[in-house]
Each structure stands twice: as structure tokens, then as C-alpha cells.
């Protein structure tokens, strides 16, 4: 006899469950359970993951791979368990059935209710019920009452779970039993506190009185006993307490783990019928998630089917894209794609994306499709993508495959500032009952895990800050004992050691649901009958509980409505060109193959240029020397994990530079990689090598690509290798060539970049480069107005604009708008005037009032206050940004005048001054600020300066430095440089190497920090803002790197520039009707901390 567990809480009951759904399924299979019900609190968020895990186990079983196989990898704990000897091939294990359900927690019932839908209709009622409760509540909550349960739970098995005492449970139990006779049970879970048998006996008596039969439940919180301490930590997080105050809220033991039949039979030895009923209930719950049939909406005119409309629009697209007539190859591609789309039932999907793109363009919103969709001629003809078959080799199977049985995925980028208009149009077009965003699961990463677990464990803020400060970026690596010793912590300390272990366990746990960046699910019928819908944190947005992986598992189509800052930048640049140059451009009409643009890129002059502005890309540009659009496609794709890890970068560059010859494997394969000099760089080429070389069908080749990573982990890649090599040998290739081809595909199967995606991005890279080359003032203005986006902060964008001879003008209350704007100079060139948006904390609404009331200008701050009606706090921000300098009023004087105005706030007895009467402060002469203080104040208020660079002022006090612009020509091999850290990078493909970009008044330098040096100077590398680096120069053409040997943190020297003027002009006068209060004094800040605040870097990993 076996057992079905009908009550399992996973970690998708956030901060409660202590195991992943996948872990619960795997453990249930190991225990031999007949069935398992995933029943999270008012949620179905984790059930698809359990379903996917069960499918994977079934696939493994079909291939005779045991659950505890030779190389079983637990993706949740990221641990691999191996066996020294191969395990004998076993019979396929018996797997549990998955029952979909949830735990309904009502506002007016002392019982929790496990709801298990028996069929699809009942499932639809459950999702509608959950949607009702979630739409009533704020994000993350669900408000349901007993009346909702009585109205909406037809067709479900309902198991009542008493919470604490049984008093008061009988009336509710009887009421629900009368409403759903034969479907209501009393769930009895052991309490594991020594009173189990007495408790179960009391439950049996209540079941008899209520006519609701008793059923055994384990009420599992974890898959194994070793998660007990983590469960207690989650309780503390949920209750906002430390572990020392948990008291009776702690689990008394580890018994709330998932149990097998033997354990449950022992606990329910006096109630065997309760155990048998678990199997009866499991048998009655026949619903499976595979029954969810998704139907895409078909919004078409009467008398025209979706397929007919798609064919009509395609024909119109051929005329538009090929006014002189399309070549035969285009017609063949169209026929092939239309046939497959019709066969798979996807025409309405293409039409929906087309309609969304057409709406955006009708509103002047730039958009562009990308990703694998650029492999589709239909997407090109419908105007969804702009990559033509003349530019890349389209491999439609990379986009849609009959073999995969998965829906296509079209990603469309829109201007990030106007994407909300598109999102709201989708809601209006289809209704919120049919359209919703996907969820994104926010997980515990290292920093959050250290912070939250450290707080629960009672670690001081200093200790947790030190630990988290040693984590790079968003790493999942946890805390290293060696790092702890460096920080003066004892890793042998029992509490600290336990904290570190718990941090490692919680990393990867879901923390809460958020909204996907733009993945929309749109249905023909009710979306809330597919998945529960809840409110998002953002106003006017709703989302389903499942993320993109969940809907992929279930074969549900989504439309990705994504935001891209560069599209916003390009559109704003086109607007500025139309306004100032009377030139009308679009992405399609930008002059192509411009030599000056490519010259600029070859010189690594690419700050702000889309996709090629990182230091790695800028270092690669002079080696690549792009001269055509396809060169840019390769440039975008080659500095990626796939080609780097596959060892393909150096062979390509050597061949491009003529240092080695391509080694063709035969005319057929040579044609596949001809444009990449015999080196496969793209996923599409991997597919074509399998088809052309090994005789695979297109579907088989795509299956190979997708399977390589998982088969490599499972240790069974040999079978695929043998099949591939045998296919190539049959086609006449040698064993050596076959093995090399397979090695190339295997080398970057995990990370290979699609050629179609690279081409879509390369188009934007070229357009942005052309704008920067020929219209630097316009490009810089648009780039600043599109922030936040990109690789560099506004300070670097401003500096780069000056390097391109663009005049920068400061913020001025009589000249600036909210946006940065262009002003015509006397010589006809364009100057860039900084806008109010550059002031930290300034609101667009306040800027609008200032501009609207400006007229012929403001003579002084008081006039601005009276005419624009802004608050004194706004005036202070303007004064701190030196926005009154055009009036001849310096920072200190302006701040003095503004605080005098603040002192004129209405008196309680006399709200209005007498006619024309204004209280005037006596004239005060304040000391002028020196240049260093001005620079500090610029960074405080705007994070940039148009004055001197900090290094220009500090250089006389730091001798022995080589300016950055001299590194390419200096004769010395060993040099020292110093500069502000503007970026830190630690790519996953760089084997622990750190790349720093330092900036001084002459330019930037690229610093390479090898792992050994990084370990020696780790805290300085990660935390310093002004670094002096001594090392050796490495030159390759115009690219110069400094290989670090010694690193010093000079951040405290930035304090020599001056201190923020917190008390430079005295105190604010309190209002008369307020009790006098001393001005709060800011906490004294260490110079290193001040440097971090004033001169932040952008760190990438």
C-alpha cells in the first residue's frame, strides 16, 4: 500500500515553505508516493515548476535513468553527487501523480481549505476564485471570504485544515459540507508535539459530528529534515523578528518534512481509513495541467480567416519591401513559412504582433523586433523586424519548429519612455479579462540573502554590510570564509558559521513575484480561467502568477513588449534633427555603409553607441576594424560567452587579419561558415552544420542544439556525439573533421548568439554610431534625455561630447528646460544646454512651472519664487546646482537668498503681506567658493561637472603619474596612473579577471586585474573610487591595457577638494508657530564614504 500527500507547501508560499517545488517532486518520487498535491497559500505560482520537474523525471525514466543517477544534479542547490562506479541500469521508477491545488486562507473562517479541482471546469473556477480575491487586494495579498468559497468551489475536493484549537470549526465545516456534499473532508495533520494521538482522536470526533470524513495529511513544509533551521529563519523574516525571539513560532522538530507511507502509517496507526482516503481523493482528482488548451485570439474582420489575413498582409509587404519585385528565394521562403504557420495554428499570433507594431508606429513610437523572430521572412514583410534575407541567412527552424512543440517567441523593443502607451493599448484592445503580463520571480541573491539572514541571526549591521560588500554585483556565490577572515571575522564562530550555511541554502529561493519586463499573455477566452490574475505594484497593470518559463512549459504564447533605451535615444535624436537641421530621418533612411562612421568605430570611439560601448567591445573594435554592416553583426555577437568559451574569437581575428588561413571542411560546410571565415559564431550556423554535414533534419538539428547542455550535465552526451559523427562519416567526412565540427557545436551550444538577434541589434548600433559621428551634439543631447540607460553615466557622456568639440552650457533658470536642449551658437554650430532633469531629486512638474512663468526671464530667486510658485525646497536645489549663476549670483549667495525666502513663510496671524510689502534681508557678503568646492557641489547636486576634473586639481599632490592620454606613446614599460573608477566589470567568461576603467582629466585607461592581484587588493578594487594603479603596459595596435601589479586606494584624497556645504550659509529660520528646533546635523562621513556617495561607479558582472 502507498500514500498520497495532499497538502504540500513549497517556497512559493513566500517566506514559509522551505523547499523548491522541484525538490518536493523529486523527493516524492524517491519516497514512492502515489500522488502529491502542491497547495501553496492562495496561489498556483509554484505548480507549473512541479509539473515541469515531473515531466523531466518521466523523460529520464523513459531513458532508464534513475532518479539517483550516476550524475544527478539538483538545480536548486547546485550540488552534484557522483558515484565512483556506474550504476546498473534499473527499471524505470514509479513516479507520483501531480495534483494541482492550493490552500485557501479566508478572512472569516478559522479553517484553512485545501482546494483540489477534479477536472478542468473546476480548475477554471479555482483560478477565477483566486483572481477575485487577488484583484480585491493589494499586490501579493488575496481577500477571500467563506461566501466566495461557497459560490466558487463547485467540482473541487475541499479539505478543511483546523488551525490550533477545534473550537468554532464545526459550524463552518457543516456549512461547507451541506453546500458540497461528498466533496468535503477534514484534514488531520500530526502536531509533532507529543500529543499526536489525542489530537487525531479529537479530529476524528469532529469529522464524525460534521459528516466530513477525516483524511490524513502531512502538511509538509520541506522535502528533507535538514531544512528545518531554514524554515525557522523564513518564519523570522516573515514575522520581522530575530531568531532569539522566535519562541513558540519555531518548528519543534523536523517532522514537517515530506514523508513516505511507512512514516504516515505509523502516525495514523489508529486511523487507517484516513490514510486510505488519500488514495481515493487522488483518484477523484483527474485534472492535469496538460489539459489546458491555449487558444490565441483571432481578432479579424468578418469573412476573413486569420490565415487569409496573414497571407494578404504578407503579399502587401512583398510589394512594400520589394517595389521592383521580390527574388524567387523570397517567394520560396514565404511559401514555406506560411505553410508551417498554418499547420501549427499560429497565424493569429503573427497578426496580433503586427497590430501592436502598427499601433506603435501610428503613434510615432519607434519599435523593432529582434531575437529569433528576425529569422522569419514573414516578420520582415509584416514590418515586425527590419532584418532582410539579404543581410543574414534566415533559418526559420530557429524561430518555429514543428519538432519542438513550443510556441514561437517574438520580442519587440519599443522606446522605453513610451512603452506604457503600448501596454495600456493592449489592455484596452483585449480587456484585462483576456490580457495580462507574465510574472517574474524575484529570488534571493547573495546580497539580499546576507542582509536578511544576517538580520535574523542577530549579526550587527556592520558585519552584514562588510559581508555583502565583498560580494561582486548580483553574485550567487555566498560568503567565502577567507573573505571573512580578511574582514576580521571568525568563520569558526558557531553562530556566524550557521549564518553562512543558511545564506547558502536560501540563495535562489523565491522572495516574491514581480511583473515581467513586457511579456504579455493574450487569450481568446477568459485569461483568468487559464491562470490567476493579480494586481501589479504599478498602477493600471495586472499580471498572471506564472513566469515565462512556466508558460513555455505549458505551450502558451506570449508577446514580448520590451523597452529599449536606445530606441528612445534615436527617436529623440531624429526629433532634434527635424527641429534644428530640418532633416527628416528614420532608421530605414539613415545613410548606409558610411565610411566616416566606420572610421570612428575602428578608432574605438564608441561611448554611447549601442552594443559596442563596453570596454571589451571598444577594445575589440580596432582589431575587428568593421567596414560593413555584416562586420557589425559579427562585432555584436563575438564578444559573448559562446564564442569566447568555444575558443572561436582568436581564430576569427587571426583569419580576418590575414595571419592564418581558413581551414575548410569541404565545399558544403565552407558555404555555411564562409561569411565568418570558417569559424561558426552563430546558433544558426550550428544548426546548418548538423544539417549539411551530418544529414540531420532541421528539427533534429535544433533538438541537438537545445539538448547538448542538459545531456552534457547528465553524462550521456556520448550518444549524441556518436550519432553526429556517424552522420558526417556517411557523408564522406573524415573522423577528425567530424570530431572538430561536433566540438565546435558543443563548445558554444549553451551561449551561442543568434545571427538574427545580432543583426537586429547591429542596425541600432550602426544608426547610433552614425548619429554620434555626424551629429555629436544631437546624439549627446538625445542620449542624456533618454537616461537612465546604457553603460556610462551622464558625467562620461558629457565629457565625451566635449571631446567631440560640443560646447556644454550649464543649467540656468533663464535658459534651461526640463530636457537638455540645443542652442544655436554664433558660428552656426549647436551647443548643448543642460536641463533641469540633471539636478538630483528635481521634479519635471516643477521644471514645467519655471518654464511656463519665465517670460523674459527672472531677475532674482525671489521673482522666480513669486511667479512660478515653486517651493523654497525647489529653489534650494536650483541654488545648489548653481542655476542662478547667469544672474551673477554664486552658489553661496543664492543659497543665502533662498533661505531668506524660506524664512518669509506666512505668519499664522497675517497670511498675506501688506500691499507690495516684502521683508528684505540685509546684504551679506559671503566668501567665494574655490574651484575644488565648486566641483564637489556639482557632483553633489548633478553627479557631473562642467568645471575641472577632480584629477586635474589633485594631480599636483600625487606625483609620479602618467596621464591617461600619454599611455599609447610613453616609452616606459612600467607606469602609474590614477583616476576615478567609472566602471568595473567581471565577466563570467574572464576566469576571475577584473576590468577597471579609470578616468582622469585627459581620458580613460583600461586596467586589467588578474585573479592573484585581485585577491591581494580585493577590498580596494571593489570599494575604491579614486585608485592609483602601478603596472606594466600591454599594447596591441591602438589598444593599450595596464596590467595591474599594485593598487592603492586614494579615495580619501577626494576630500581635499572640499566638503559639501551643509552648514555654509547658516541655519533655516523656524516658522513662528513652530517650536524652535536645532538644525539636524549630518552624520560625520568618512572621506572614503563621501567619495562613494559623490563619485559612484557603474559595476557590471
UniProtKB/Swiss-Prot annotation:
Residues 1065-1074 have a biased composition (Polar residues). Its EC number is 2.7.7.7. It comes from the Bacteria. Gene3D superfamilies: Metal-dependent hydrolases. DNA polymerase involved in damage-induced mutagenesis and translesion synthesis (TLS). It is not the major replicative DNA polymerase. Belongs to the DNA polymerase type-C family. DnaE2 subfamily. This is Error-prone DNA polymerase.
Amino acid at each position: 500500500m502507498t500514500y498520497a500527500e495532499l497538502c504540500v507547501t513549497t517556497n512559493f508560499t513566500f517566506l514559509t515553505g522551505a523547499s523548491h517545488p522541484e525538490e518536493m517532486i523529486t523527493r516524492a518520487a524517491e519516497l514512492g508516493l502515489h500522488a502529491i498535491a502542491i497547495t501553496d497559500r492562495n496561489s498556483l505560482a509554484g505548480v507549473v515548476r512541479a509539473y515541469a520537474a515531473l515531466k523531466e523525471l518521466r523523460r529520464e525514466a523513459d531513458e532508464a535513468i534513475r532518479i539517483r543517477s550516476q550524475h544527478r544534479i539538483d538545480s536548486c542547490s547546485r550540488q552534484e553527487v557522483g558515484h565512483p562506479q556506474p550504476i546498473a541500469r534499473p527499471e524505470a521508477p514509479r513516479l507520483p501523480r501531480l495534483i494541482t491545488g492550493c490552500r485557501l486562507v479566508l478572512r472569516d473562517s478559522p479553517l484553512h481549505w485545501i482546494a483540489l479541482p477534479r477536472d478542468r471546469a473546476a480548475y477554471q473556477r479555482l483560478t477565477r476564485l483566486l483572481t477575485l480575491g487577488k484583484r480585491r487586494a493589494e499586490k501579493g495579498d488575496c481577500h477571500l471570504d467563506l461566501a466566495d468559497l461557497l459560490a466558487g468551489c463547485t467540482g473541487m475536493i475541499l479539505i478543511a485544515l483546523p488551525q490550533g484549537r477545534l473550537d468554532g470549526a464545526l459550524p463552518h465545516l457543516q456549512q461547507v459540507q451541506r453546500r458540497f456534499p461528498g466533496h468535503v473532508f477534514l484534514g488531520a495533520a500530526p502536531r509533532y508535539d507529543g500529543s499526536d494521538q489525542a489530537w487525531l482522536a479529537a479530529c476524528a470526533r469532529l469529522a464524525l459530528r460534521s459528516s466530513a470524513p477525516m483524511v490524513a495529511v502531512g502538511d509538509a513544509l520541506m522535502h528533507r529534515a535538514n531544512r528545518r533551521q531554514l524554515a525557522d529563519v523564513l518564519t523570522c523574516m516573515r514575522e520581522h523578528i530575530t531568531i532569539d525571539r522566535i519562541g513558540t513560532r519555531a518548528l519543534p522538530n523536523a517532522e514537517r518534512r515530506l514523508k513516505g507511507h511507512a512514516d504516515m502509517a505509523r502516525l495514523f496507526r489508529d486511523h487507517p481509513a484516513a490514510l486510505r482516503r488519500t488514495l481515493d481523493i487522488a483518484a477523484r482528482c483527474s485534472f492535469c495541467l496538460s489539459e489546458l488548451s491555449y487558444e490565441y485570439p483571432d481578432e479579424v474582420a468578418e469573412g476573413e480567416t486569420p490565415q487569409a489575413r496573414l497571407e494578404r498582409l504578407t503579399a502587401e509587404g512583398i510589394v512594400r519591401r520589394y517595389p521592383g519585385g521580390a527574388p524567387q528565394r523570397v517567394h520560396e521562403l514565404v511559401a514555406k513559412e506560411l505553410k508551417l504557420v498554418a499547420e501549427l495554428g499560429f497565424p493569429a499570433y503573427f497578426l496580433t504582433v503586427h497590430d501592436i507594431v502598427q499601433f506603435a508606429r501610428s503613434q510615432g513610437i519607434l519599435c523593432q523586433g529582434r531575437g529569433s523572430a528576425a529569422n522569419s521572412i514573414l516578420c520582415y514583410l509584416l514590418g515586425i523586424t527590419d532584418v532582410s534575407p539579404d543581410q543574414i541567412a534566415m533559418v526559420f527552424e530557429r524561430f518555429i519548429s514543428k519538432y519542438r512543440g513550443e510556441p514561437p517567441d517574438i520580442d519587440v523593443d519599443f522606446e522605453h519612455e513610451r512603452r506604457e502607451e503600448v501596454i495600456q493599448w493592449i489592455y484596452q484592445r483585449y480587456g484585462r479579462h483576456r490580457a495580462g503580463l507574465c510574472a517574474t520571480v524575484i529570488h534571493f541573491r547573495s546580497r539580499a540573502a546576507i542582509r536578511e539572514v544576517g538580520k535574523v541571526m542577530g549579526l550587527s549591521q556592520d558585519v552584514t554590510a562588510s559581508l555583502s560588500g565583498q560580494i561582486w554585483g548580483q553574485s550567487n556565490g555566498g560568503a567565502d570564509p577567507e573573505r571573512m577572515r580578511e574582514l576580521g571575522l571568525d568563520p569558526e564562530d558557531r553562530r556566524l558559521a550557521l549564518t553562512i550555511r543558511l545564506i547558502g541554502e536560501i540563495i535562489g529561493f523565491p522572495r516574491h513575484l514581480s511583473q515581467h519586463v513586457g511579456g504579455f499573455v493574450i487569450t481568446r477566452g477568459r485569461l483568468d480561467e487559464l491562470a490567476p490574475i493579480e494586481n501589479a505594484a504599478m498602477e493600471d497593470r495586472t499580471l498572471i502568477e506564472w513566469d515565462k518559463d512556466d508558460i513555455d512549459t505549458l505551450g502558451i504564447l506570449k508577446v514580448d513588449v520590451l523597452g529599449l533605451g536606445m530606441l528612445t535615444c534615436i527617436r529623440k535624436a531624429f526629433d532634434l534633427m527635424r527641429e534644428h537641421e530640418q532633416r527628416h530621418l528614420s532608421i530605414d533612411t539613415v545613410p548606409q555603409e558610411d565610411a566616416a562612421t566606420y572610421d570612428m568605430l575602428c578608432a574605438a570611439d564608441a561611448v554611447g553607441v549601442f552594443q559596442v560601448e563596453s570596454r571589451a567591445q571598444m577594445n575589440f573594435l580596432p582589431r575587428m576594424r568593421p567596414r560593413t554592416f555584416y562586420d557589425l553583426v559579427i562585432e555584436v555577437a563575438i564578444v559573448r560567452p559562446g564564442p569566447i568559451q568555444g575558443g572561436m574569437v582568436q581564430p576569427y581575428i587571426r583569419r580576418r587579419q590575414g595571419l592564418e588561413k581558413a581551414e575548410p571542411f569541404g565545399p558544403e560546410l565552407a558555404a555555411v561558415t564562409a561569411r565568418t571565415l570558417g569559424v561558426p559564431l552563430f546558433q544558426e550556423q550550428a544548426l546548418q552544420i548538423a544539417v549539411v554535414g551530418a544529414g540531420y533534419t532541421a528539427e533534429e538539428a535544433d533538438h541537438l542544439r537545445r539538448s547538448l547542455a542538459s545531456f552534457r550535465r547528465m553524462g550521456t552526451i556520448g550518444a549524441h556525439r556518436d550519432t553526429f559523427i556517424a552522420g558526417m562519416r556517411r557523408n564522406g567526412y573524415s573522423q577528425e573533421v567530424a570530431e572538430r565540427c561536433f566540438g565546435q557545436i558543443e563548445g558554444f551550444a549553451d551561449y551561442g548568439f543568434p545571427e538574427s538577434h545580432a543583426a537586429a541589434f547591429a542596425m541600432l548600433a550602426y544608426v547610433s554610431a552614425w548619429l554620434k559621428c555626424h551629429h555629436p551634439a544631437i546624439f549627446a543631447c538625445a542620449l542624456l534625455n533618454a537616461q537612465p540607460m546604457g553603460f556610462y553615466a551622464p558625467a562620461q557622456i558629457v565629457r565625451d561630447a566635449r571631446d567631440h568639440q560640443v560646447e556644454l552650457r550649464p543649467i540656468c533658470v533663464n535658459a534651461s528646460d526640463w530636457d537638455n536642449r540645443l542652442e544655436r551658437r554664433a558660428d552656426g554650430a549647436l551647443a548643448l544646454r543642460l536641463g533641469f532633469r540633471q539636478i538630483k531629486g528635481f521634479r519635471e512638474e516643477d521644471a514645467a512651472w519655471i518654464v511656463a512663468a519665465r517670460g523674459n526671464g527672472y531677475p532674482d530667486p525671489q521673482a522666480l519664487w513669486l511667479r512660478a510658485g515653486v517651493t523654497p525646497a525647489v529653489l534650494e536645489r536650483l541654488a545648489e546646482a548653481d542655476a542662478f549663476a547667469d544672474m551673477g549670483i554664486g552658489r553661496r549667495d543664492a543659497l543665502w537668498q533662498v533661505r531668506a525666502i524660506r524664512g518669509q513663510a506666512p505668519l499664522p496671524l497675517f497670511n498675506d503681506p501688506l500691499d507690495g510689502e516684502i521683508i528684505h534681508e540685509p546684504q551679506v557678503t559671503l566668501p567665494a567658493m574655490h574651484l575644488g568646492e565648486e566641483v564637489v557641489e556639482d557632483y553633489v547636486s548633478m553627479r557631473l561637472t562642467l568645471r575641472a576634473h577632480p584629477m586635474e586639481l589633485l594631480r599636483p599632490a600625487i606625483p609620479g603619474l602618467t596621464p591617461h592620454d600619454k599611455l599609447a606613446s610613453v616609452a616606459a614599460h612600467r607606469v602609474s596612473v590614477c583616476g576615478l573608477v567609472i566602471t568595473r566589470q567581471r565577466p563570467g567568461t574572464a576566469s576571475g579577471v577584473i576590468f577597471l576603467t579609470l578616468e582622469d582629466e585627459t581620458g580613460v585607461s583600461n586596467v586589467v586585474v588578474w585573479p592573484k592581484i585581485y585577491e591581494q587588493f580585493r577590498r580596494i578594487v571593489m570599494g575604491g573610487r579614486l585608485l592609483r594603479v602601478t603596472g606594466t603596459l600591454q599594447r596591441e595596435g591602438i589598444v593599450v591595457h595596464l596590467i595591474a601589479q599594485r593598487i592603492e586606494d586614494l579615495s580619501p584624497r577626494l576630500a581635499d577638494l572640499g566638503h559639501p556645504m551643509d552648514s555654509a550659509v547658516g541655519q533655516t529660520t523656524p516658522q513662528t508657530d513652530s517650536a524652535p528646533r536645532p538644525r539636524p546635523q549630518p552624520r560625520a562621513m568618512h572621506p572614503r564614504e563621501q567619495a562613494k556617495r559623490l563619485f559612484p561607479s557603474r559595476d557590471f558582472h
